[in-house]
């Protein structure tokens, strides 16, 4: 059976834990110069319909560190789903490469790719979810604070794709998920309902202080995601959800701060917080590399 990595909800808790534990080992081996290359001779196709820095570099470097190679394919060059159906593209690519990573807008394009591909398909990001980011976040949290199970993670800001995957992660990893968003920016009900139906404790409010109270980790993201540049910046409904020193005082004394980057300093987070001692954003960015190496290895049967 082909191993896809599409969403945390599509994975078992056991498989996700296996990937996190493997990432920890691979990271240590990389630092020690003893890392193995289990994907030697393998080729990863990377399809980008949305631009990226971290996703492209981390998958490219990660695949190379595992001994494999990558092929970059831009959405404009491929005309995915226009000149050729996504299903046909998936079938053709499956004859050439050993895995496909796609970063796209419409989540349905990811699912259609996986439906027709005979090689693993990995979700590099869609407008709905961003599971690779949450794997990096869990790895980072546990490096600094130990097991995430039973801890409280708080989100403040927009109800976007990263939050959707954090919500799914709460059911799979066993952490409590608090979130505060402005009216009209709530996460999609299907993610909340799925998490609650799978045993997660999730709290949705519109008060940042309420969500952050006692939290072990505070997470935010840009208020303006790609394709949302029409929304006003700065002085808008998101201002009360800014992560600043005053808000962090409501969290646990040793709470971590996370942000998937890029950050708009002075908007969703202040310099005081992102550059402060509680911030682990650059560890988090590095761990995209290590978490995704283990996702790649798991998908291709090397874990």
UniProtKB/Swiss-Prot annotation:
Keywords, sorted A to Z: Amino-acid biosynthesis, Arginine biosynthesis, Cytoplasm, Transferase
Pathway(s) this gene product operates in, as recorded in its UniProt entry: Amino-acid biosynthesis; L-arginine biosynthesis; L-arginine from L-ornithine and carbamoyl phosphate: step 1/3
Name of protein: Ornithine carbamoyltransferase
Protein's cellular compartments: Cytoplasm
Any GO MF annotation of the entry: ornithine carbamoyltransferase activity
Catalytic reaction equation(s): carbamoyl phosphate + L-ornithine = L-citrulline + phosphate + H(+)
Residues binding L-ornithine, per UniProt: 161, 221, 225-226
Example GO BP: citrulline biosynthetic process
Tagged with keyword Amino-acid biosynthesis: yes
Pfam families the record matches: OTCace, OTCace_N
Nucleotide-binding as UniProt keyword: no
Role this protein plays: Reversibly catalyzes the transfer of the carbamoyl group from carbamoyl phosphate (CP) to the N(epsilon) atom of ornithine (ORN) to produce L-citrulline.
PROSITE patterns: CARBAMOYLTRANSFERASE
GO CC annotation terms, alphabetical: cytoplasm
Entry similarity comment: Belongs to the aspartate/ornithine carbamoyltransferase superfamily. OTCase family.
InterPro entries associated with the record: Asp/Orn_carbamoyltranf_P-bd, Asp/Orn_carbamoylTrfase, Asp/Orn_carbamoylTrfase_sf, Asp_carbamoyltransf_Asp/Orn-bd, Orn/put_carbamltrans, OTCase_ArgI
Residues at which carbamoyl phosphate binds: 52-55, 79, 103, 130-133, 260-261, 288
EC number, UniProt record: 2.1.3.3
Broad class of enzyme this protein falls into: transferase
């Amino acid at each position: 059976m082909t191993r896809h990595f599409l969403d945390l909800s599509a994975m078992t808790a056991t498989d996700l834990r296996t990937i996190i534990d493997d990432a920890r080992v691979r990271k240590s081996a990389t630092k020690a110069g003893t890392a193995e290359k289990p994907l030697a001779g393998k080729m990863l196709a990377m399809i980008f319909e949305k631009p990226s820095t971290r996703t492209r570099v981390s998958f490219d470097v990660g695949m190379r560190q595992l001994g494999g190679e990558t092929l970059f394919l831009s959405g404009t060059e491929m005309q995915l789903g226009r000149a050729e159906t996504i299903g046909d593209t998936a079938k053709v690519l499956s004859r050439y490469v050993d895995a496909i990573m796609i970063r796209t807008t419409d989540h349905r394009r990811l699912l259609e790719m996986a439906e027709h591909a005979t090689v693993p398909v990995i979700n590099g990001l869609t407008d709905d979810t961003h599971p690779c980011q949450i794997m990096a976040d869990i790895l980072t949290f546990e490096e600094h604070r130990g097991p995430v199970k039973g801890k409280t993670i708080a989100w403040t800001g927009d109800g976007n794709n990263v939050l959707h995957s954090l919500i799914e992660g709460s059911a799979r990893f066993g952490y409590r998920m608090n979130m505060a968003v402005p009216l009209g920016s709530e996460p999609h009900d299907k993610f909340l309902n799925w998490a609650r139906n799978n045993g997660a404790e999730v709290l949705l409010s519109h008060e940042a202080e309420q969500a952050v109270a006692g939290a072990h980790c505070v997470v935010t993201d840009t208020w303006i995601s790609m394709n949302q540049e029409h929304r006003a910046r700065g002085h808008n409904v998101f201002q009360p959800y800014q992560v600043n020193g005053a808000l962090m005082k409501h969290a646990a004394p040793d709470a971590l701060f996370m942000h998937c980057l890029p950050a708009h300093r002075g908007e969703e987070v202040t310099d005081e917080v992102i550059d402060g001692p509680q911030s682990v954003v650059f560890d988090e960015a590095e761990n995209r590399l290590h978490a995704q190496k283990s996702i790649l290895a798991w998908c291709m049967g090397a874990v």
